[in-house]
Swiss-Prot record:
Organism from which the protein derives: Pectobacterium atrosepticum (strain SCRI 1043 / ATCC BAA-672) (Erwinia carotovora subsp. atroseptica)
Subcellular location as annotated: Cell inner membrane
Lineage: superkingdom: Bacteria
Primary subcellular site in the record, as a coarse category: membrane
SUPFAM superfamilies according to UniProt: N-terminal domain of the delta subunit of the F1F0-ATP synthase
Subunit: F-type ATPases have 2 components, F(1) - the catalytic core - and F(0) - the membrane proton channel. F(1) has five subunits: alpha(3), beta(3), gamma(1), delta(1), epsilon(1). F(0) has three main subunits: a(1), b(2) and c(10-14). The alpha and beta chains form an alternating ring which encloses part of the gamma chain. F(1) is attached to F(0) by a central stalk formed by the gamma and epsilon chains, while a peripheral stalk is formed by the delta and b chains.
Protein name listed in UniProt: ATP synthase subunit delta
Family indicated by similarity: Belongs to the ATPase delta chain family.
């Protein structure tokens, strides 16, 4: 997977720079999302890993995408097909999203709790994370009954585990030592 990250980086950066220059971040993210979904399709993935000429592969891929791609998006597909890189489109999308988040100074924060949190709780979490990270945050809330109570907050590689489950596990470790 790390190979895909390395391969996808220049394509994501080129698409991002072009999108910023043309004030088309939403459009490009949409095109990349659609293209990534097409590339994830089993039949298309099989086609991409086959021995089809790059020009034919690009034509087929663009035809499948239809009017979801503008001329610049089609050019990206042609270049990636020529270099045999269409399989990394999902990673190109991920890196594009990360570049956009960095530009907009936002970060995705996963909030995992045992039950649904109310608006007041969510706004307190958002405010605390914005202060801690010095960025705007976008909360992604998930319910996981195994948390029992409390919350687990993930932002990038930072994890704040305030769940009862983790406290019980730590207590069990202390009692066993």
């Amino acid at each position: 997977m790390s190979e895909f990250v390395t391969v996808a980086r220049p394509y994501a950066k080129a698409a991002f720079d072009f999108a910023v220059e043309n004030q088309a971040l939403d459009r490009w993210q949409s095109m990349l999302a659609f293209s990534a979904e097409v590339a994830r399709n089993e039949q298309i993935a099989e086609l991409l890993s086959g021995a089809i000429a790059p020009i034919e592969l690009a034509k087929t891929f663009i035809a499948v995408c239809g009017d979801q791609l503008d001329e610049a998006g089609q050019n990206l597909i042609r270049v990636m097909a020529e270099n045999g890189r269409l399989l990394v489109l999902p990673e190109v999308l991920e890196q594009f999203i990360q570049l956009r988040a960095a530009l907009e100074s936002t970060v995705d924060v996963d909030v995992i709790s045992a039950s649904t949190l109310n608006e007041q709780q969510l706004s307190k979490i958002a405010a605390a994370m914005e202060k801690r990270l010095s960025r705007k945050v976008k909360l992604n809330c998930k319910i996981d009954k195994s948390v029992m109570a409390g919350v687990v907050i993930r932002a990038g590689d930072m994890v704040i585990d305030g769940s009862i489950r983790s406290r019980l596990e730590r207590l069990a470790d202390v009692l066993q030592s």
